């Protein structure tokens, strides 16, 4: 039996912790593969690295500085599915951990 893929959903996941992000992606993929036979692709996007330079001294000694960085890891899940299936109910069932931000785009 051939399944028609009428619609596509992109779920964009972002997190500062790459282990949380990978486990969240795997959790969503497992939920969707256990209930549906659709095609799911995980795309890894480049990590954004923000570096902040802070002076250690309050008013003098500009040579003494400290650098801090924040890395934002990103993934995109492309889900092709049949439009008759309630895909949003399955995605809301995923219960992602705090610290993982997600956006859902329909196309």
UniProtKB/Swiss-Prot annotation:
Q: Name one GO molecular function term.
A: structural constituent of ribosome
UniProt cross-references to SMART domains, sorted A to Z: Ribosomal_S10 (SM01403)
> What are the top taxonomic ranks of the organism?
Eukaryota, Sar, Stramenopiles, Ochrophyta, Bacillariophyta
Organism, per UniProt?
Phaeodactylum tricornutum (strain CCAP 1055/1)
Question: A cellular component term (GO) from this record?
Answer: ribosome
Q: Which GO terms describe its biological process?
A: translation
What is the name listed in the Swiss-Prot or TrEMBL entry for this protein? Small ribosomal subunit protein uS10c
Could you tell me the keywords of this UniProt record? Chloroplast, Plastid, Ribonucleoprotein, Ribosomal protein
Q: Which domain of life is it from?
A: Eukaryota
């Amino acid at each position: 039996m051939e399944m028609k893929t009428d619609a596509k959903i992109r779920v964009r996941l972002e997190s500062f912790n790459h282990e949380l992000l990978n486990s969240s992606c795997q959790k969503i993929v497992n939920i969707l593969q256990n209930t549906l036979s659709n095609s799911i692709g995980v795309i890894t996007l480049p990590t954004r690295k923000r570096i902040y330079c802070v002076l250690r001294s309050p008013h003098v000694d500009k040579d003494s500085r400290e650098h801090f960085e924040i890395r934002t890891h990103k993934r995109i899940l492309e889900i092709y599915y049949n439009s008759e299936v309630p895909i949003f109910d399955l995605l809301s069932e995923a219960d992602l951990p705090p610290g993982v931000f997600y956006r859902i785009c329909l196309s």
